[in-house]
């Protein structure tokens, strides 16, 4: 598999990762181990990836792992096509824990909370990790493939 310039730079500096190739727009995708993510996030920020464009999470496969995905952009004045990278961090479904990058990119606040609420990934050291869309009393993680839909629905008055 062809590695991009960022992957080559990380290899040169002994940063452990795995290249996953490029997406349809030519954005390099890298896999980072959960235990290394907080320190590598700081390296990427210092290197110039100063904008967290988006963060999301998904269930990879029933009985498999969960993934937290970060789309980072290197914003610079006078540059029309900023550099982008996609980072994927995987966690086991039985104890899904990933370090929070709230302290690196503040925009991760609500995005990591939504991923926690919908998929159940716990983001370590997040200052306000609690449900954001579902009630605190909700049981389960609605976007997991093994989620069982409750057999009740609250009827709400639209008026």
From Swiss-Prot:
Give this protein's Gene Ontology molecular function annotations. Answer: NADH dehydrogenase (ubiquinone) activity; quinone binding
Cellular localization per UniProt: Plastid, Chloroplast thylakoid membrane
Which cellular component, as a GO term, is one annotated location?
chloroplast thylakoid membrane
EC identifiers of the protein: 7.1.1.-
Keyword Cell membrane appears in the UniProt entry: no
Query: Organism's domain of life?
Result: Eukaryota
Q: Which PROSITE patterns match?
A: COMPLEX1_30K
Question: What does the record give as the reaction this protein catalyses?
Answer: a plastoquinone + NADH + (n+1) H(+)(in) = a plastoquinol + NAD(+) + n H(+)(out); a plastoquinone + NADPH + (n+1) H(+)(in) = a plastoquinol + NADP(+) + n H(+)(out)
Write the record's keywords in alphabetical order, separated by commas.
Chloroplast, Membrane, NAD, NADP, Plastid, Plastoquinone, Quinone, Thylakoid, Translocase, Transport
Which tissues does the record link to its expression? Leaves.
Q: Which membrane topology describes this protein?
A: Peripheral membrane protein
The UniProt entry, under InterPro entries, shows: NADH_DH_suC (IPR010218), NADH_quin_OxRdtase_su_C/D-like (IPR037232), NADH_UbQ_OxRdtase_30kDa_su (IPR001268), NADH_UbQ_OxRdtase_CS (IPR020396)
Any matching Pfam family: Complex1_30kDa
Q: Which family does it belong to?
A: Belongs to the complex I 30 kDa subunit family.
Q: How does it assemble?
A: NDH is composed of at least 16 different subunits, 5 of which are encoded in the nucleus.
Q: Can you name this protein?
A: NAD(P)H-quinone oxidoreductase subunit J, chloroplastic
| Species whose genome carries this gene | Zea mays
Task: State which gene encodes it.
Answer: ndhJ
């Amino acid at each position: 598999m062809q590695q991009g310039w960022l992957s080559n730079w990380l290899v040169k500096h002994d940063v452990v990762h795995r290249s996953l190739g490029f997406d349809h727009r030519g954005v390099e995708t890298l896999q980072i181990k959960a235990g290394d993510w907080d320190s590598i996030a700081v390296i990427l920020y210092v290197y110039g990836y100063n904008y967290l464009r988006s963060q999301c999470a998904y269930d990879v496969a029933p009985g498999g792992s969960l993934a937290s995905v970060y789309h980072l952009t290197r914003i610079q004045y006078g540059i029309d096509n900023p550099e982008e990278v996609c980072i994927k961090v995987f966690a086991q479904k039985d104890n899904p824990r990933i370090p929070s990058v709230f302290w690196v990119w503040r925009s991760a606040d609500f995005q990591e909370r939504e991923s926690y609420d919908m998929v159940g990934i716990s983001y370590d050291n997040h200052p306000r990790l609690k449900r954001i869309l579902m009630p605190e009393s909700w049981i389960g993680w609605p976007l997991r493939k093994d989620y069982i839909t409750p057999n009740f629905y609250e009827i709400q008055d639209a008026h």
